UniProtKB/Swiss-Prot annotation:
Protein's UniProt name: Oxaloacetate decarboxylase
CDD domains xrefs: ICL_PEPM (cd00377)
Subunit-structure text: Homotetramer; dimer of dimers.
InterPro entries recorded: ICL/PEPM (IPR039556), Oxaloacetate_deCOase_bac (IPR023687), Pyrv/PenolPyrv_kinase-like_dom (IPR015813), Pyrv_kinase-like_dom_sf (IPR040442)
Protein's UniProt keywords contain Membrane: no
Alphabetized SUPFAM superfamilies for the sequence: Phosphoenolpyruvate/pyruvate domain
The protein's required cofactors: Mg(2+)
Lineage top rank: taxon: Bacteria
């Protein structure tokens, strides 16, 4: 079977955005997982920033991974992937000029689409980890991303957090990102269908939701009717891999180790608790 080019895969992603149903992403974190996802029939894979940090650095999601490290992992994945890969590009690794570099590098890696979020990253001294940058700065990042894009088929998605700001600000930000030219809007923190409908009714671009498996948002037909095209349920495949590795090695060693679940394992082996203490001690950052 002939291989699809990166341009072909980007065009396929565009077709998904223009379809009349929603698609659930597969968490792809290395070349093997990308091949498995495509073979099982997933239409889209996602390389999450948190998963990339764990996979590359064994570090928690504290914006420790560099653009170069993230791009290297994306390149490995896209070298073999025969499904569109969506990159969680966090805040674009800096200001609007850094966003341009991020888009250029990820496009060259073969990514089909990427999200640029308006979270204040990395967290600043004395600020909450969920604080957002100003709307005008965020719009500048979207415009810069579009300027840096060479292949017009690659989708630029503006992301905001509906769980930490009020309804009117969510609408204002999403509409501003649409006006700036974003190909879709990614929403985090949607609570239920009433919450989603109140926002979706004010927007015109396709929507992407990060739900983390929220049981209140599991009706695919209703999601599609509200304009949702991409759903990210989380990264269960990655955490299942961590759990399987731990269980296999524990059995092989025949040691009396604790039977930890995937979440406990990721916290333990990424030394996440240390980073929380350091952030509070040296930066006065609170979760």
């Amino acid at each position: 079977m002939p291989r699809l080019s990166h341009h072909d895969l980007r065009r396929n992603f565009r077709e998904l955005l223009n379809a009349d149903r929603c698609f659930h992403t597969a968490s792809v974190f290395d070349p093997m997982s990308a091949r498995i996802a495509a073979d099982l029939g997933f239409e889209v894979g996602i390389l999450g920033g948190s998963v990339a940090s764990l996979q590359v650095l064994a570090a928690p999601d504290f914006n420790l991974i560099t653009l170069s490290e993230f791009v290297e992992q994306a390149t490995r994945i896209c070298r073999v992937a025969q499904l569109p890969v969506l990159a969680d590009a966090d805040h674009g690794y800096g200001n609007a000029l850094n966003v341009m570099r991020t888009v250029s590098e990820l496009e060259r890696a073969g990514i089909s689409a990427l999200t640029i979020e308006d979270t204040l990253l990395p967290p600043k001294f004395g600020r909450r980890s969920t604080d957002l940058i100003g709307m005008f700065e965020a719009v500048g990042k979207i415009r810069a991303a579009l300027e840096a894009r060479v292949d017009p088929e690659m989708a630029i998605i503006g992301r905001t957090n509906a769980g930490v700001i009020g309804f009117e600000e969510v609408i204002a930000r999403a509409q501003a990102y649409e006006k700036a030219g974003a190909d879709a809007i990614c929403l985090v923190g949607i609570e239920d269908f009433d919450h989603l409908e109140s926002i979706a009714s004010q927007l015109s671009k396709p929507l992407m939701l990060v739900t983390y498996g929220n049981p209140n948002l599991r009706d695919n037909a209703r999601l599609a009717a509200l304009g949702v095209r991409i759903v990210v349920n989380g990264h269960a495949a990655y955490f299942a891999a961590i759990k399987a590795t731990y269980d296999c090695l524990r059995e092989q060693r025949q040691v009396d180790a604790l039977d930890l679940n995937a979440s406990q394992l990721s916290v333990k082996y990424s030394t996440a608790d240390e980073y929380v203490v350091w952030a509070e001690e040296y930066m006065q950052v609170k979760e």
